[in-house]
Each structure stands twice: as structure tokens, then as C-alpha cells.
A protein has these predicted regions:
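Terminal low-complexity/charged segments
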Residues: 1-173, 337-342, 350, 407, ...
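Generic, well-ordered alpha-helical scaffold segments in large soluble proteins
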Residues: 37, 98-99, 224-228, 246, ...
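Short coil/turn segments at secondary-structure boundaries
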Residues: 49-51, 258-261, 293-298, 332, ...
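Short secondary-structure capping/junction motifs at helix and strand boundaries
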Residues: 101-110, 231-238, 290-294
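Short, glycine/acidic-rich hinge or "gate" loops at secondary-structure transitions
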Residues: 106-114, 264-269, 294-298
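Active-site- and interface-proximal helix/loop "cap" or "latch" segments in soluble metabolic
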Residues: 150-258, 263, 272, 285, ...
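Intrinsically disordered, low-complexity regulatory segments
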Residues: 269-273, 277, 283-433
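Flexible, glycine/threonine-enriched loop-and-boundary segments that flank and lead into catalytic domains
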Residues: 426-447
Length: 500
């Protein structure tokens, strides 16, 4: 008998009205058949999350950009684990157990992910949260094995303004044999804070989920809210949203180059990139009222229109910025720095595909996926994803430089021809489910939510870090210990969006 394919499994399932992609409810037998089918079919796992009675997964079929949402019931507190066939599911499964208490049957790793034993309750999103432990257990890590193996803990406190992440390295001399990340130190309780609120009220929490992707997260959340209620933002708002997203992309890429300059001692690179980023931040504040563009994108459109002279300010800033691109590229090509970055943090295409890594990391390794291809609003703009195949920091920086150039072109066209009309609509107090996505500076961002009479019953945001941190563990293995900070910078590792 021919085993069922994902297509036949979905065709035989109950489809729930979720927009723009239906959510398929699968009994455990069909969910296990899906797991078997994933052994042979190339669907990437985007996200895995839960509510009080079900577990949900979001899959992407790269070649056709097909998005698949599936769910299965939690029976006797458990559901069949996906991590055996999709390793990227492992941190999601650990997160689900921490927040809802659902157990991933046959999962290889059941250690806590977010819960460090410091919360006032356990299982905070379950119907019956438990009492906090009197003496919380410290995080556990595999024992170092082999002759002369030593352990080196790094973080979460580093004495710098940086993301709070704990890395446990196993070393042989100065070479890293294996690496394991432990996150959750910046958990904010975002999912609990959002429940019961309107999308417009919850948007403030989403805007603060990850500071360097505030526009992208807000945009994906707004699109999910609008899809759930079958509402569209006005044309002027859609154009402004695209402009804001590209402005954020340029700023974050410049921030990467500035950080790279600090870590490598390339003072010229740092000076050029930091100066350009500051110039863009001032223009953003003048045009939209916030240097990081926070709270501008909201469900229904944008919170306010561009300033009366905003288009002139942005175009003037772009004109000045264009002049910095040649010296920026020259600084990256300076022989000592170029030699240092060549081959750094190599990501094979197979690894990027296996873990579903997108953004600059995925495209720098040859994975041709950019969530903007799913965005109908980009349909009228000439745009093409930048792909490199070397998979190292040099390739990723080339992607960043060319994305900056592409963003300049997109913003220039948008700022010159903004449609007239309102910048927002009021969302109806209806019920429904929606999924939204946006291409953030570090990769694809996805939001799902369920609304009940205008209020959020359940929601989940998927940050690119869910794919990038497991990938970093593979990349760090074999690297030199002195390169850890540089590799973290190279891969664009952040934690706040993943820590929820």
C-alpha cells in the first residue's frame, strides 16, 4: 500500500476557516501519518505552538511557497512529537511543555526551555497553572565526554548591552567540539498579556517583542488580524507599511556592519555604518515620530500618517545615504577584514533547509526564500530576492549590501507616489482566525491569532530566531572559541522575539 502524502492527508481532513490558509484538524493517526510523510517530503517547519486543547504546526513547501497549517488534539496531556523528523521542532516542544504542560510523546529532549524555575506559577497558559517550585533546579546540560574535554559557559550576563543568552561550549583546547544554547532569560509573558485584548491594544506588546524587528512583527500581526476579520488596510497604509519595513531592513543591516566593525577592530567600517544608521534614525523620527518606527504599524493600517514634510525628509536622507554605500562596500572589502570574514560561520544549504533558516542566513547559503514573495502588496514593485551560495559571512554581507540597495529603490518609488486616502480602518469586533507574515531583517516572521468577538482568544508569534539558534549550535561546532561573539553577530542571533 502506498503511504499517504501530505496532500492526501490534508484532503481527508477537516479544514477550519483560517485565512488566508485554512487550518487542517488531524486526528492522532493522521498526525502520525503526517510525521511519516515529512520523512520524504520537503516541507519546512515554520512554527509549532499550542492552546489549551490542541497543538498547531505551520509548514512551508519551499518550491511552490505553499503554506500548510495543521492541528491535532492533546490527548491525556500528550501529542506525537514532530522533532524526530523536523529537528527545528525541539525548542518549540520544550516551550509548549513549559507554557501549557502538553507533553511531546517520544521527544528526545524534555528539559525546560523558557521556565527557569523563577516564575510565580508553572504552566501559566494552562487552564490550571501550578505552584512554583520551592527550590528550582538549575539548567541541565549533557556531560562533556572525551579526553581533555572542558566546558566553558558564556552568559547570560555578559557585562555588555547584548542579548541575554547562555551558551555552554564543550572544548578541545581552543576548538569548540559542541555548543548548546539555553534561552528564556528575557521572557515577557507576551502570550498571556495579549489574551482578552483587542488586536489594536495587543499591538503594543507585539511592537516590543523584538526591538530590531518592531515593524516586521507589527506588520505580520496586523496582517493576521486583518485576515481573521476579512479586512484590508487602505492602499495608502499598505504603501507606508512597505516603506517602513524597508527602512527598518536598511537600519538593521547597517547595525550589523557597525557591530562587525567593533568586533573585528575595523574602525572605519564602524564609523561609516554607525553614522549612516544614525542618519536614518533621525529621518525616521522626523517623518514618523519614532527612531525605531515603533507603534506605527497597527491592525487596520498605520497609527498616523507620514509628517507633512516626511517624504522630502526621507528622500533627502536616501540621497545622502547613497553616497555612503561605496565607502561602506570598500571597508568590507579591505583585505585584512575580508580575509577575517571569508569562510566565517559557514552554513551549508542542507543545514539551512533542514532547520528552515531564512533571511540573510538562508539566502546567503542558497535557500531562495523571501517572505516578500508571498506579499501581494509587493506585486506592483520590481523586486527580486538576492541569493548567494557560499554560505559564509562574506556571502551574507553581500546579501545585506544588495538588500540595502534594493530597499533604497523600493523606498524611492514608494515615497514619490504614495496613494491618497485614509491611513487606517476600524476593525470590526468579529471572530475568526488569521495568519500573517512579513520578511524581517533577520528572516521570515509569522503570526497566528484567533479572535472571539473582537478579542484575542489565542495567538502565537514566530520569530526567525527559532531557526537561527539551533543552526548556530551546528555552526559553532568546530569553530574557535575566540570567534563566538563574531559568529553570533554574523548569524544575526537575537533572543527577545524567541523568548516571548
Amino acid at each position: 500500500m502506498t503511504p499517504p502524502t501530505i496532500a492526501t492527508i490534508l484532503a481527508a481532513s477537516q479544514a477550519e476557516p483560517c485565512r488566508p490558509w485554512p487550518r487542517h484538524r488531524l486526528p492522532h493517526t493522521a498526525w502520525r501519518a503526517l510525521i511519516d510523510a515529512l520523512r520524504h517530503e520537503p516541507h519546512r517547519l515554520l512554527a509549532l505552538w499550542a492552546d489549551t486543547i490542541e497543538v498547531h504546526a505551520l509548514l512551508l513547501h519551499d518550491p511552490g511557497l505553499g503554506v500548510v497549517a495543521v492541528s491535532t488534539a492533546v490527548e491525556v496531556g500528550a501529542y506525537p512529537a514532530l522533532s524526530a523528523v523536523r529537528p527545528a521542532a525541539e525548542p518549540f516542544e520544550r516551550m509548549i511543555r513549559d507554557l501549557w504542560g502538553h507533553h511531546a510523546a517520544d521527544a528526545g529532549d524534555e528539559r525546560p526551555w523558557l521556565d527557569h524555575g523563577q516564575w510565580p506559577v508553572t504552566l501559566p497558559l494552562s487552564p490550571r497553572p501550578g505552584s512554583a517550585p520551592i527550590e528550582p533546579e538549575p539548567p541541565s546540560f549533557p556531560t562533556a565526554e572525551g579526553d581533555h574535554a572542558t566546558r566553558l559557559p558564556i552568559g547570560p550576563v555578559a557585562g555588555l548591552i547584548t542579548d541575554a543568552a547562555h551558551l555552554r561550549l564543550t572544548l578541545s583546547g581552543t576548538a569548540i567540539r559542541s555548543a548548546e544554547a539555553h534561552l528564556g532569560y528575557t521572557h515577557k509573558g507576551t502570550l498571556a498579556l495579549m489574551r482578552g485584548k483587542s488586536p489594536r491594544a495587543a499591538a503594543r506588546f507585539i511592537a516590543r517583542l523584538s526591538g530590531d524587528a518592531t515593524v516586521a512583527h507589527s506588520l505580520a500581526f496586523a496582517r493576521a488580524s486583518e485576515a481573521a476579520l476579512e479586512t484590508e488596510a487602505p492602499p495608502r497604509a499598505q504603501a507606508l507599511r512597505l516603506l517602513l519595513a524597508e527602512w527598518e531592513r536598511m537600519s538593521v543591516h547597517l547595525g550589523h556592519f557597525a557591530d562587525l566593525g567593533v568586533l573585528t577592530g575595523a574602525a572605519g567600517l564602524h564609523r561609516i555604518a554607525e553614522g549612516a544608521r544614525e542618519h536614518l534614525a533621525r529621518a525616521a523620527e522626523a517623518a514618523f515620530g519614532h527612531r525605531l518606527l515603533m507603534d506605527v504599524v497597527v491592525p487596520g493600517g498605520v497609527s498616523h500618517d507620514i509628517a507633512p514634510d516626511g517624504q522630502v525628509v526621507l528622500r533627502a536622507a536616501l540621497t545622502a545615504f547613497v553616497e555612503t554605500l561605496p565607502p561602506l562596500a570598500a571597508a568590507l572589502e579591505h583585505p585584512p577584514l575580508a580575509s577575517r570574514l571569508s569562510g566565517l560561520a559557514h552554513v551549508p544549504l542542507a543545514l539551512a533547509n533542514r532547520l528552515g533558516a531564512g533571511g540573510v542566513v538562508g539566502r546567503g547559503s542558497g535557500r531562495a526564500f523571501d517572505a516578500r514573495a508571498l506579499d501581494e502588496a509587493h506585486g506592483g514593485i520590481e523586486w527580486e530576492a538576492e541569493i548567494q551560495r557560499q554560505g559564509d559571512e562574506t556571502a551574507r554581507n553581500l546579501v545585506r549590501l544588495r538588500e540595502i540597495a534594493a530597499s533604497i529603490g523600493i523606498i524611492d518609488r514608494l515615497s514619490g507616489f504614495l496613494p491618497d486616502g485614509p491611513v487606517a480602518v476600524t476593525l470590526p469586533a468579529g471572530s475568526g482566525e488569521g495568519i500573517g507574515c512579513a520578511e524581517g531583517p533577520h528572516g521570515d516572521i509569522w503570526h497566528w491569532l484567533r479572535l472571539d468577538h473582537g478579542h484575542i482568544a489565542a495567538a502565537f508569534p514566530r520569530d526567525p530566531a527559532w531557526a537561527l539558534w539551533p543552526l548556530a549550535e551546528h555552526v559553532l561546532a568546530g569553530a574557535a572559541v575566540e570567534d563566538v561573539a563574531l559568529i553570533r553577530c554574523s548569524l544575526g542571533l537575537t533572543v527577545s522575539g524567541m523568548d516571548l
